[in-house]
């Protein structure tokens, strides 16, 4: 019988129960025992849901209090020295939270660990920090306790752990030069014995299968990392009394395929949604291994074409029999939990969609079809009818948008003058001091703001009342920025629920859910828009808010837009046309907004592209095509302004060395970036490339509630000035302030402005 399994399930809860419990605990409103009870209840509920859907092997270890990589670091005892962890004591929950956030209800505050994107997704993981002589030990029992929980509830647990090579590859350390540094492989001698001990612990618990995630096998790996695989897995297999399922996802294995097939594991999972590995080469080399195929898209929300999936796997099933397993392509972490909750989506659109729970039901339909179960026929027919209806729907295509997209090839992608001439005109218009200060855009979203927005959407406030409340918040934000003496102001984005959702609600072709939340990091959840059809802007989206803010001050106020690539990347995107076409439709809509902002007297316009790098294909051979259309879309949206209008962009959690030419090709007048957690290391790319335009390196980490020190920020900017001309430098936080409290924001920005003043005096 074909085994159905799941690589992971969303941990946040259908109504974000984990987020609410986390934040209550951090605020001191919930005891740790109460927080742990919430986590246990969510695990129990999610396991039951998966079992009801027909999952045979239950993933355990996909739950995490903040991030699964951080969770595994704590299990291994990988705790940086600044957190003062006793080398012989267990790593407790508050230490884990301090590593993630810089502080917790107990323990001394310290600088949080670096956070970065999980491959090409919008999820973030906490980067493990390794010393050159790093030791490892089992320092936390929670994973083993969860295995016992699952067994007690009658499930067959399949623990899920990061593979040792993926864990090292994703780590950093002062002695190591980037992800690919083979010097990290020297730590395997210390690491592998602990992995062997972990596997033995699982065996002692009666575990039959362990899922070891090695997603770096979909990357372009150096030879040294490829060669390490056989050595590592020989050692793991020789000690393991459980069966090992090597899981890969987010793409095909390419030249790593034969390496994976040679490993002494009992099963191999391949992503058949994003991967294109030749199964004709896999089967002859598979031996007696299990082949798990990820045939349900774990990263999007559209119904699966089950007929096509069956066509692809039926012959394989005939050949492999029970050694063919079925699963989603990757963890369902990247999907909302349950479509059944959605009571505001219209029935037509809803019939096209599938969330995590529904994806497991699709998996069960495939499994039933392979098993010859006639009971699945009606489900297959329902699926078939929904796909056909979507393809024929008049809501998908807009002839006017298609014509404008065709005409866009004739539009210029260049500013009127080069940067050196533009910046002189901009300085004359804006009259900014050296080391000008600004923020990235958003200010704290208070309870009053959220209540007003909720009441407005519920009809308890009319449009005029809501506008008045938002204008009061904007005025408050402008007053504070003037008091603290910032140079380029923002309106604070009080009216925006989310930097992508806000724009999607005002553009044609988008739809929104009520409960379609996915985890971005920690307690931060986002509700991605659904791009189901052609995109266009029916009317101005931000102009009146920006015009009002500018009327309150003589200082320049930035217009704030989210860029086309980021809107694309942070949405669930239609799968019936190339992503580049959808992105250009968004770019044309933003081009109209940029022009209207300029006409309204807004002389600084920021188009955020924090997701530009995460859109890179994982294989470098595919980068050029992506970067060509991504840069084209940004320029399509921005180049129509006059020379004295200053275009800003913002990027966060990015590494720039390998895409610096594309960043320069955007030709933004000012780029602000996240650098505080990396101690300005990211600026090396801009120095080595001789980046020509202005740069604002983030001087403090907004993800931590700790107050930034003036001297530390001055020191960071002095490091920046060693790498870049000081006349090109701006001073700003590393990201928006939406998630911070007002008292934290006031203290941090006052210190930041004082740092800028000290820099001016010293220059």
From Swiss-Prot:
Function: Catalyzes the transfer of a methyl group from 5-methyltetrahydrofolate to homocysteine resulting in methionine formation.
Protein name per Swiss-Prot or TrEMBL: 5-methyltetrahydropteroyltriglutamate--homocysteine methyltransferase
Keywords: Amino-acid biosynthesis, Metal-binding, Methionine biosynthesis, Methyltransferase, Repeat, Transferase, Zinc
Intrachain disulfide bonds: none
Binding site for L-homocysteine: 440-442, 493, 608
Membership in a protein family: Belongs to the vitamin-B12 independent methionine synthase family.
Top EC class for this record: transferase
Residues that hold 5-methyltetrahydropteroyltri-L-glutamate according to the record: 16-19, 117, 524-525, 570, 614
GO process annotations (BP): methionine biosynthetic process; methylation
Methyltransferase listed as a keyword: yes
Gene from which this protein is expressed: metE
Binding site for L-methionine: 440-442, 493, 608
């Amino acid at each position: 019988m074909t085994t159905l399994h799941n690589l992971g399930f969303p941990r946040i809860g259908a109504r974000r129960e984990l987020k609410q419990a986390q934040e209550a605990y951090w605020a001191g409103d919930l005891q740790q025992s109460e927080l742990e009870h919430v986590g246990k209840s969510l695990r129990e509920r999610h396991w039951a849901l998966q079992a009801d859907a027909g999952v045979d092997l239950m993933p355990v270890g996909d739950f995490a209090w903040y991030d699964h990589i951080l969770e595994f670091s704590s299990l291994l005892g990988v705790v940086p020295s600044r957190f003062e962890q006793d080398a012989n004591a267990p790593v407790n929950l508050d230490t884990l939270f301090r590593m993630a956030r810089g502080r917790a209800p107990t323990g001394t505050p310290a600088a949080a660990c670096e956070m970065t994107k999980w491959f090409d997704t919008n999820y973030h993981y906490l980067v493990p920090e390794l010393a050159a002589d790093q030791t490892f030990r089992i320092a936390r029992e929670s994973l083993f306790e969860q295995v016992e929980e699952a067994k007690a509830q009658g499930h067959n647990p399949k623990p899920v752990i990061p593979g040792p090579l993926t864990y090292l590859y994703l780590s950093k350390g002062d002695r190591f030069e980037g992800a690919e540094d083979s010097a990290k492989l020297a730590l395997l001698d210390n690491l592998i014995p602990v992995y062997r001990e972990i596997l033995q612990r699982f065996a002692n618990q009666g575990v039959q299968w362990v899922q070891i995630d090695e997603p770096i096998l979909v990357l372009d790996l150096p030879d040294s990392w490829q060669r390490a695989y056989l050595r590592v897995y020989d050692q793991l297999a020789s000690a393991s009394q459980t069966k090992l399922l090597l899981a890969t996802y987010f793409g095909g294995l390419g030249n790593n395929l034969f390496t994976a097939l040679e490993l002494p594991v009992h099963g191999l999972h391949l992503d058949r949604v994003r991967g294109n590995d030749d199964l004709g080469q896999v089967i002859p080399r598979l031996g007696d291994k299990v082949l798990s195929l990820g045939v349900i898209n774990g990263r999007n929300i559209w119904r699966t074409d089950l007929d096509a999936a069956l066509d692809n796997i039926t012959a394989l099933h005939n050949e492999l029999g029970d050694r063919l397993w079925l699963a989603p392509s990757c963890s369902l972490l990247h999907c909302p939990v349950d479509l059944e909750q959605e009571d505001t989506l219209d029935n037509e659109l809803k019939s096209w969609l599938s969330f995590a729970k529904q994806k497991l039901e699709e998996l069960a339909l495939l499994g039933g079809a392979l098993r010859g179960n006639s009971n699945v026929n009606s489900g297959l027919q329902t699926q078939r009818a929904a796909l056909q209806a979507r393809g024929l729907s008049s809501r998908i295509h807009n002839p006017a948008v298609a014509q404008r997209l065709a005409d866009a090839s004739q539009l210029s992608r260049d500013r009127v003058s080069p940067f050196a001439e533009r910046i002189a005109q901009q300085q004359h218009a804006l009259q900014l001091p050296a080391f000008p200060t600004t923020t990235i855009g958003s200010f704290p979203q208070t309870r009053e703001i959220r209540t007003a927005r909720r009441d407005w959407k519920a009809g308890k406030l009319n449009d005029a009342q809501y506008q008045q409340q938002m204008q009061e918040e904007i005025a408050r934000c402008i007053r504070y920025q003037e008091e603290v003496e910032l140079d380029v102001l923002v309106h604070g984005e009080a009216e925006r629920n989310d930097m992508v959702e806000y724009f999607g609600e005002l553009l044609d072709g988008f739809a929104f859910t009520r409960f379609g939340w996915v985890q971005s990091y920690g307690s931060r959840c986002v509700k991605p828009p659904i791009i189901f059809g052609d995109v266009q802007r029916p009317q101005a989206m931000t102009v009146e808010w920006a015009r009002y803010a500018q009327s309150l001050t003589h200082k320049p106020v930035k217009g704030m837009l989210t860029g086309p690539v980021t809107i694309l990347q942070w949405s669930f995107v239609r799968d019936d046309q190339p992503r580049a076409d959808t992105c250009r439709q968004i770019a044309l809509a933003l081009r109209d907004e940029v022009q209207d902002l300029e006409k309204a007297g807004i002389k600084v316009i920021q188009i955020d592209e924090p997701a530009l790098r995460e859109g890179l294909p994982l294989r470098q051979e595919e980068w050029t095509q992506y970067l060509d259309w991504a840069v084209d879309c940004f320029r399509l949206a921005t180049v129509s302004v006059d020379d004295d209008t200053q275009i800003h962009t913002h990027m966060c959690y990015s590494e720039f060395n390998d895409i610096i030419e594309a960043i320069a090709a955007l030709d933004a007048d000012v780029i602000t970036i996240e650098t505080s957690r990396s101690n300005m290391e990211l600026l090396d790319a801009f120095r080595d490339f001789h980046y020509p335009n202005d740069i604002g390196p983030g001087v403090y980490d907004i993800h931590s509630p700790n107050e930034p020190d003036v001297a530390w920020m001055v020191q960071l900017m002095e490091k920046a000035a060693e790498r870049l001309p000081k006349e090109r430098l701006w001073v700003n936080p590393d990201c928006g302030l939406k998630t911070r409290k007002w008292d934290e924001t006031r203290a941090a920005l006052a210190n930041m402005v004082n740092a800028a003043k000290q820099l001016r005096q010293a220059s």
